[in-house]
Amino acid sequence: MEFMIRKAEPKDIPDLCFLLGELSGHTLTPADVEDRLRMIEESAIDELYVYEQENTLQGLLGFRIRENVEEPSRYGEISVLITKPEMRQLGVGRVLMEFAEQRARDLGCKGTWLVSGFGREEEAHKFYTRLGYKATGYRFVKPL
């Protein structure tokens, strides 16, 4: 089946509400997602792509460039990766990851990285490991 990966657009808002809600565990309103799209449009480093197959949005990839202060290098950060539940295990996530890695190469990045939370070891962490990613540390968060 043919597919395309393209930048997210306002027409995608209903599907984006669903996918981002699945990922975050929170309900997002169309106004929330419209705000996020506006932020991405105004950002010099953030990008949001959709995987579309047969005119149906099936997956979502958030990507941004991270410049390092401590060394002269940059990385591509995969900030969002999710597919519709019925599309999991069908290669959509792999295609989106490959797209992100190529985008990072095209922008002169040293590599790609992502953050994946606890409780996702059975699916997401195994998926990332199969793609060649290695766990290198922890993220520490303090609510304010």
Where are these regions (language model features)?
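Acetyl-CoA-dependent GNAT
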Residues: F3, P10-K11, F18-S73, S79
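Conserved acetyl-CoA-binding loop of GNAT-fold acetyltransferases
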Residues: C109, Y128-Y138
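Alpha-helical elements of Rossmann-like donor-binding domains used by nucleotide-donor carbohydrate transfer enzymes
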Residues: D15-L19, D35-R36, V95, F99, ...
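Conserved beta-strand-loop-alpha-helix junction that forms the acyl-donor binding cleft
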Residues: W113-A124, P143
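Residue-level recognition of the GNAT/N-acetyltransferase active site
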Residues: E9, R66, K84, R88, ...
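Conserved acetyl-CoA-binding loop-helix of GNAT-fold acetyltransferases
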Residues: V80, Q89-Q102, K126, R130
